[in-house]
């Protein structure tokens, strides 16, 4: 760990720093959610490496050391989207109606945008600014209610 960062965190967290340091040394938790627009199902995936997310519908944790979901053909077809649990929680907690217009000014890498758009109906619109010209998740996931701009602010 960078010494300057470590010193700053020790000063900021004080007595809570050991818990923070311990958390940094834990194995990361990986997750994904099923794309509702593809009517995906986990039946096609190896359930031995999957655990249902306790709070988010159609979301699962997976053992990334033994099951490489990012290399699976269903990932490239948009059946599911791999996303960190903390990022998934943000979009899941947003209070919006299914026909709202939602603006994401910092849509890189696009996971929260995709998750939010999947919760909107066809009457809703997700407007995203994603500066990566090579990224096409919205197309792969067949999200027709997403309008993407590539504006560097």
Locate predicted features:
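S-adenosylmethionine
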Residues: 1-153
């Amino acid at each position: 760990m960078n010494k300057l960062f470590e010193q700053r965190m020790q000063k900021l967290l004080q007595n809570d720093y050991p818990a923070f340091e311990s958390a940094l040394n834990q194995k990361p938790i990986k997750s994904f959610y099923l794309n509702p627009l593809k009517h995906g199902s986990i039946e096609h995936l190896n359930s031995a490496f999957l655990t249902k997310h306790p709070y988010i519908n159609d979301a699962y944790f997976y053992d990334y050391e033994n099951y490489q979901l990012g290399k699976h053909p269903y990932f490239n077809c948009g059946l599911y989207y791999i996303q960190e649990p903390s990022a998934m929680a943000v979009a899941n907690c947003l209070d919006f109606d299914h026909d709202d217009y939602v603006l994401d000014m910092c849509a890189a890498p696009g996971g929260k945008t995709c998750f939010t758009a999947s919760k909107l109906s066809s009457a809703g619109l997700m407007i995203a600014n994603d500066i990566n010209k090579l990224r096409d998740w919205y197309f792969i996931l067949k999200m027709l209610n997403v309008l993407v701009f590539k504006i560097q602010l």
